[in-house]
A protein has these predicted regions:
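Juxtamembrane boundary at the C-terminal end of a transmembrane helix
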Residues: 221-230
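Helix-loop-helix hairpins and the membrane-proximal interhelical loops
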Residues: 80-92, 115-116, 139-154, 172, ...
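Helical membrane-embedded segments and adjacent short helical loop/helix-boundary regions
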Residues: 2-16, 20-82, 87-98, 102
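Hydrophobic/small/kink-forming positions within alpha-helical transmembrane segments
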Residues: 13, 17-18, 104, 156, ...
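Small-residue-rich segments of transmembrane alpha-helices in multi-pass membrane proteins
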Residues: 39-51, 71-74, 97-110, 128-138, ...
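Short alpha-helical transmembrane interface motifs in multi-pass membrane proteins
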Residues: 7-8, 59-60, 93-95, 121-122, ...
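Alpha-helical membrane segments and immediately flanking helix-loop junctions
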Residues: 123-150, 156-157, 172, 176-214
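Transmembrane alpha-helices that form the ion-translocation and gating core
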Residues: 97-133, 158-173
Length: 230
């Protein structure tokens, strides 16, 4: 069976799309954040590759083409932001302060946990970019000397958790303002969380999209500083 799949140039694309489609079906049917399409697709893909004894490189020969769509997809996040540009102008100080607070909270939390659990410096810097988009996070981790592959995994996990828990956490802490919701989600769980923000509303999606870019820049600068604290 593995020989049949390995001979197909579209193995990665097919498995990825079908598993994600199945995850989307489950989420629509059960209407719960636990059935996150990305999380479901990751689990299905891993199980499939292990069962069919297919190595990652063979899978990635086809799946890499989907990665090429990441940049234009990210650029499309500017559309809801443009549609809410007047709202952004009126609240620019609050927005920037909120994003800065989120970035500092993330970096400080990682530093404190690294001290408590006595992580090595390499392990510590690996976690610093956990809340920003993968493309930026990989560069930060590599520059600081972290484990890039682990950084990617942590970023994905952070995003999935944000996507699943964001709405519930906002309700628990009574965060009702759409701008506050968008900033909180985008700053803490990047593009994956932004998908959830867009489900909540247009304003939430726009503010979350902005937060991805701004928090990415601030985290790059902040990570360099925090990396030299411990």
């Amino acid at each position: 069976m593995s020989e049949f799949f390995e001979s197909s140039a579209f193995l990665g694309v097919t498995v990825s799309l079908l598993s994600y489609a199945f995850g989307s079906f489950l989420k629509k049917k059960f209407k719960t954040g636990i059935f996150n399409p990305l999380l479901i697709s990751i689990v299905i893909t891993i199980v499939f590759l292990l069962y069919c004894n297919i190595d990652y490189d063979t899978y990635n020969d086809g799946a890499k083409y989907l990665s090429w769509l990441l940049t234009p997809a990210t650029a499309c996040l500017a559309i809801p932001l443009y549609q809410q540009i007047e709202l952004l102008k009126k609240n620019h100080k609050v927005v920037l302060f909120g994003i800065l607070s989120g970035v500092l909270t993330s970096l400080t939390t990682i530093m404190v946990l690294a001290i408590i659990f006595k992580l090595s410096h390499k392990e510590y810097v690996t976690l610093l970019p956990k809340s920003i988009t993968t493309a930026i996070g990989m560069g930060v981790s590599e520059e600081l000397g972290g484990y890039v592959t682990i950084t990617v995994a942590v970023i994905v996990i952070t995003g999935v958790l944000g996507n699943i828990l964001a709405d519930g956490i906002c309700k628990i802490f009574k965060i009702n303002h759409p701008i506050a919701k968008g900033i909180a989600i985008g700053t803490s769980s990047h593009a994956i969380g932004t998908a959830k923000a867009m489900e909540l509303g247009e304003v939430e999606g726009a503010m979350s999209s902005l937060s991805i870019a701004v928090s990415g820049i601030l985290t790059v600068l902040g990570a360099i500083i925090f990396a030299h604290i411990i």
